């Protein structure tokens, strides 16, 4: 993969536009609850500041309506947190597309939520050209959005005088290549979470590559349905049962497996006060909701992880935010932390689980990408990386 790297360039005195991924979770009061993505963007920003560049950073946050900036869509909390990390004040610039603001060499500003700009998501050419005029060097450091061709991830890279990969983007690509192109076997993928339909096609692709495919959350429930099990009121997608069957068949033909839960933790509601019951997967009642894997299943998953050569982790296996449904994810996280295998983990919920169980130092590489992380594993062309390759040619 041939791209220009930020560290290959002389950025001193240059106007540098960095597209970062600062899409961090916030609570209802607007407080940032987990800041891994901001921390991950620091190396490129610091590198440019230390070299005396005039630095502009932008990101998306949430899913705003284009053309409307609402309070909850503002990057203001991110500007404050970024300033604390850099020990400097970071100005937040609104209505920035047409310029009209000044950035001094050695200064960094944050450009307000790029998804508020009309034409961002549709990769509008006119918008991309305007943004390209703001800089001498465009840096894509947002691996998390590399699978989307948008104006700040793709369009601007066509028109900026120079387009390169930031330090995070470069590290992401190197780590993912190591996990995918030459993985040490057995290769184990853990795919969990509630976004069933968005991950099933990716599961299909992983089915032809991995030795074991551990599924969790809403995804596992769909597989349990496919296996003829009753899942009560659990989150699942019955219309995708056929797809789940196909995945299990692909794995079986290769001598690989999808180890399904044999015991589960159920409750009649998802709440902090819910009473958790550990039962066999054959004893799920009509009103039960499966909210975690049971201890026997967790131990089985831990054993698979202990014997792995490479581990790819995206998504928890239960509602780990609530302590009574966190056991499965906790045991799995611990197994990954203690494993000798090269492990790569990614996705918002996964990052939160890693933080909760304090295993960040024991994971081989933590990816900041969710969908991009999985699509790269699938071998899809990521538009944001493809355009950087094109510009380097």
Curated annotation (Swiss-Prot):
Primary enzyme class: transferase
UniProt keyword annotations, A-Z: ATP-binding, Cytoplasm, Glycolysis, Kinase, Nucleotide-binding, Transferase
Keyword Kinase part of the UniProt annotation: yes
Pathway: Carbohydrate degradation; glycolysis; pyruvate from D-glyceraldehyde 3-phosphate: step 2/5
Signal peptide: none
Protein residues bound to substrate: 21-23, 37, 60-63, 115, 148
Its EC number(s): 2.7.2.3
GO molecular function (one): phosphoglycerate kinase activity
Database matches in InterPro entries: Phosphoglycerate_kinase, Phosphoglycerate_kinase_CS, Phosphoglycerate_kinase_N, Phosphoglycerate_kinase_sf
Reaction catalyzed: (2R)-3-phosphoglycerate + ATP = (2R)-3-phospho-glyceroyl phosphate + ADP
Name of the protein: Phosphoglycerate kinase
Source species: Dechloromonas aromatica (strain RCB)
């Amino acid at each position: 993969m041939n791209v220009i790297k930020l560290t290959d360039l002389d950025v001193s005195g240059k106007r540098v536009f960095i597209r970062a991924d600062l899409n961090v979770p916030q609570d209802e009061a607007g407080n940032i609850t987990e800041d891994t993505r901001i921390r991950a963007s620091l190396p490129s920003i610091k590198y440019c500041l230390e070299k005396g560049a005039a630095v502009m950073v932008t990101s998306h946050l949430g899913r705003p309506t284009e053309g409307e900036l609402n309070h909850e869509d503002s990057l203001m909390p991110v500007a404050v947190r970024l300033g604390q990390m850099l020990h400097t004040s970071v100005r937040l610039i609104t209505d920035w597309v047409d310029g009209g603001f000044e950035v001094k060499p050695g200064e960094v500003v944050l450009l307000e939520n790029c998804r508020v700009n009309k034409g961002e998501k549709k990769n509008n050419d006119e918008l991309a050209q305007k943004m390209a005029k703001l800089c001498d060097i465009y840096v894509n450091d947002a691996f998390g959005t590399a699978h989307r061709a948008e104006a700040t991830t793709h369009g601007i890279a066509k028109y900026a005088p120079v387009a390169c990969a930031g330090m995070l983007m470069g590290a992401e690509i190197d780590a993912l290549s190591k996990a995918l192109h030459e993985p040490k076997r057995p290769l184990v993928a853990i795919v969990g979470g509630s976004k069933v339909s968005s991950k099933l096609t990716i599961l299909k692709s992983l089915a032809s590559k991995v030795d074991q495919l551990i599924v969790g959350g809403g995804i596992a429930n769909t597989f349990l349905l496919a296996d003829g099990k009753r899942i009560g009121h659990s989150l699942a997608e019955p219309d995708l049962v056929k797809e789940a069957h196909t995945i299990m068949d692909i794995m079986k033909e290769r001598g690989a497996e999808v180890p399904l839960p044999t015991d589960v933790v159920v409750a009649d509601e998802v709440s902090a006060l819910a009473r958790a019951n550990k039962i066999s997967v054959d004893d799920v009642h009509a009103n039960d909701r499966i909210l975690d894997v049971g201890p026997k299943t967790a131990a089985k998953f831990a054993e698979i992880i202990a014997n792995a050569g490479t581990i790819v982790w995206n998504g928890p296996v239960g509602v780990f935010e609530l302590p009574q449904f966190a056991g499965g994810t906790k045991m799995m996280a611990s197994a990954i932390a203690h494993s000798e295998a090269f492990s790569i983990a990614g996705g918002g919920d996964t990052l939160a689980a890693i933080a909760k169980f304090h295993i960040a130092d024991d994971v081989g590489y933590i990816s900041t990408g969710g969908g991009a992380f999985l699509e790269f594993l699938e071998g899809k062309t990521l538009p944001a990386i493809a355009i950087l390759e094109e510009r380097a040619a």
